[in-house]
């Protein structure tokens, strides 16, 4: 992991968007640490939108529609759930500074969530940042089997339909590789990023999903 600069508590939403546009993103040492540091990986994780794929078994589950999938209806709740400890993630980097910054980006129309509901219960979701024609995935959670996977599938379908050209996952994991995630070198990523963020901001929501 490549770090840039020292810890900082003076980051504003506008500075955060500028950082994304040049390949940086913030993290914290822990949820209890109010400070952030910038990260610029030497190898950047992306999911090429034209080669995203998933298993036949997951496709079968998706056809059964086990969850009600929504967009941008419970952003704060998704953020809270992503910040909660889980058996496979005893601690997280989502501190109060992160919460405040990404809530501000959501209010500006630059952060979004995909949510899986089981009845009235939020059981899975993910959130990320949109800028130009790029979407930067930040975190996801799952409280039911396959919930976050299904949210990812719906995210990619939405990004494709709306005209996004870059899905940045920051890092690759074995889990994300099953969906087609790859590592790209910093120089190659910079070219892809510049192309994506210099395009006009692509709307994430459909017209009927926008509150009057």
From Swiss-Prot:
This is Leucyl/phenylalanyl-tRNA--protein transferase. It comes from the Bacteria. The lineage of its organism: Bacteria, Pseudomonadati, Pseudomonadota, Alphaproteobacteria, Hyphomicrobiales. Its main location: cytoplasm. Functions in the N-end rule pathway of protein degradation where it conjugates Leu, Phe and, less efficiently, Met from aminoacyl-tRNAs to the N-termini of proteins containing an N-terminal arginine or lysine. The gene is aat. SUPFAM superfamilies: Acyl-CoA N-acyltransferases (Nat). The keyword Kinase does not apply. It comes from Allorhizobium ampelinum (strain ATCC BAA-846 / DSM 112012 / S4). Pfam families: Leu_Phe_trans (PF03588). Its EC number is 2.3.2.6. It is found in: Cytoplasm. It catalyses: N-terminal L-lysyl-[protein] + L-leucyl-tRNA(Leu) = N-terminal L-leucyl-L-lysyl-[protein] + tRNA(Leu) + H(+); N-terminal L-arginyl-[protein] + L-leucyl-tRNA(Leu) = N-terminal L-leucyl-L-arginyl-[protein] + tRNA(Leu) + H(+); L-phenylalanyl-tRNA(Phe) + an N-terminal L-alpha-aminoacyl-[protein] = an N-terminal L-phenylalanyl-L-alpha-aminoacyl-[protein] + tRNA(Phe). One of its GO terms (biological process) is protein catabolic process. One of its GO terms (cellular component) is cytoplasm. One of its GO terms (molecular function) is leucyl-tRNA--protein transferase activity. Belongs to the L/F-transferase family. Keywords: Acyltransferase, Cytoplasm, Transferase.
């Amino acid at each position: 992991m490549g770090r840039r600069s020292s810890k900082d508590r003076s980051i504003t939403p506008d500075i955060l968007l500028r950082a994304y546009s040049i390949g940086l993103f913030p993290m914290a040492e822990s949820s209890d640490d109010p400070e952030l540091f910038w990260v610029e990986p030497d190898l950047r994780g992306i999911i090429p939108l034209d080669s995203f794929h998933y298993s036949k078994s997951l496709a079968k589950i998706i056809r059964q529609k086990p969850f009600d999938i929504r967009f941008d209806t419970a952003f704060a709740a998704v953020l809270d759930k992503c910040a909660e400890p889980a058996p496979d993630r005893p601690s997280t980097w989502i501190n109060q500074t992160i919460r405040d910054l990404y809530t501000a980006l959501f209010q500006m129309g630059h952060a979004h969530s995909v949510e899986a509901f089981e009845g009235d219960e939020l059981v899975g979701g993910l959130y990320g940042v949109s800028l130009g024609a790029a979407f930067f995935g930040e975190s996801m959670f799952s409280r039911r089997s396959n919930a976050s996977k299904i949210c990812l599938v719906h995210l990619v379908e939405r990004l494709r339909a709306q005209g996004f050209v870059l899905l940045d996952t920051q890092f690759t994991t074995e889990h994300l590789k099953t969906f087609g995630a790859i590592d790209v070198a910093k120089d190659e990523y910079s070219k892809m990023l510049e192309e994506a963020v210099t395009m006009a901001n692509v709307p994430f929501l459909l017209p009927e999903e926008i509150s009057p």
